A protein has these predicted regions:
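Extracellular/periplasmic carbohydrate-active domains that bind, remodel
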Residues: 1-370
């Protein structure tokens, strides 16, 4: 069954709030058995923060052809950490080739969380909580106020042919952030934003990232980990056939300098191209962005990490950096056929190792310090 938001009173003028209409149409589709399509035709639809909650009786596909636009007025979204949220939905599909415009420039100056611990979080553009067996495809997210996409407590989700865009200096605009979720695929997509292209927090398991172009941004990151007690492990990440262009980091694992105990293991990074990337390969167990962290050794154990066929150019002299914990050294780190060059003023490309155990095979440029 097709549910056209225009027939329920949606106004595609870019100024009228359509959140009640969208809520009503989703509820109708959700309570209908079989396959149901929510159609959002061409046009620009202003939308206040909305939660679309299951479980649903049948399958729901949100087919977005037009543009959804967030509110500019922050007084109406203060302390609301989402814009569009899907919860407890199974077999959800988002498709259509449309666009989500978070209107980030109206709020980025208010993003003070990196400096102010009492800050009010800005809205994440698209949140998925407890969503299963779902696909997000052929969509564009631009200028999120905070992260573009957040995936929490989800299972068996596929993101493909997604375009994520924000300026490189936009604060905290992570592309896709994953936590407490398993069997998540991110395929055939382009992410160009102001923070991590993809980031994984505790409880991320069996994550597959393939054929993704990242840049600008901060790279693909695991962490920061160890920030709280009883964190779930990160287990099973595969990143293949990806390209990084001008990013602040490439493949990064980071843990807090003085952390609680947890583990990160079974990570594989293969067939990666670096184009003028700072820190192409980095493990940082002294992570402290505020420079005001408690001193001590990280208690996060990093092991079974494989890097294979990583090639291209580094914008930093140190192209491979393993700064592991003295208390919990990195174990079973494997480097296979690394070819990274540096053409800056600091001299020959180099690697740096601290508290790491592993093996290097095949070509190694820079020369391996393992």
């Amino acid at each position: 069954m097709v549910f056209n938001v225009m027939k329920d009173g949606a106004v595609a003028d870019g100024n009228t709030d359509n959140s009640k209409v969208f809520q009503n149409v989703f509820n109708k589709a959700c309570q209908s058995e079989g396959r149901n399509l929510v159609l959002i035709p061409r046009g620009t639809y202003m939308l206040a923060p909305i939660v679309l909650k299951g479980p649903c009786k049948g399958q729901v596909e949100f087919h977005i052809i037009g543009t959804l636009k967030a509110l500019i007025d922050e007084t109406s979204t203060v302390d609301i950490n989402h814009w569009i949220t899907f919860q407890y939905v199974d077999r959800l599909v988002l498709s259509g080739g449309g666009k989500l415009d978070g209107q980030g420039p109206s709020a980025w100056d208010d993003n003070t969380c990196s400096k102010n611990p009492n800050c009010k979080a800005l809205p994440i553009s698209l949140r998925f909580d407890f969503v299963t067996n779902s696909r997000i495809t052929q969509l564009t997210s631009i200028n999120s106020k905070n992260a573009h996409v957040n995936v929490f407590a989800c299972k068996d989700m596929k993101f493909d042919h997604i375009h994520i865009i924000a300026p490189k200096d936009s604060p905290n605009t992570d592309g896709i952030h994953i936590g407490s979720s398993s069997n998540i695929q991110i395929l055939d997509s382009t992410i160009a934003t102001g923070d991590d292209c993809v980031s994984m927090s505790p409880g991320s398991k069996n994550i597959n990232i393939r054929n993704v172009t990242c840049g600008p941004g901060h790279g693909i990151s695991v962490g920061s980990l160890g920030g709280g007690p009883n964190e779930e492990d990160v287990n099973g990440l595969t990143v293949t056939n990806c390209t990084f262009i001008g990013t602040q980091n490439g493949l990064r694992v980071k843990t807090w300098a003085r952390s609680y105990a947890s583990s990160v293991f079974n990570l594989t990074f293969e067939d990666i191209i670096m184009d003028n990337v700072n820190n192409p390969i980095i493990i940082d167990q002294q992570y402290c962005p505020s420079r005001n962290c408690e001193k001590g050794d990280s208690q996060v154990q990093i092991r079974d990490v494989k890097y294979g066929n990583i090639r291209g150019t580094s914008s930093s002299k140190i192209a491979v950096a393993f700064d592991c914990s003295k208390g919990k050294p990195c174990e079973k780190i494997e480097l296979n056929n690394i070819n990274l060059t540096y053409h800056g003023a600091e001299g020959a490309v180099a690697s740096s190792c601290s508290n790491v155990k592993g093996i290097a095979n095949g070509q190694q440029q820079p020369g391996s310090c393992i």
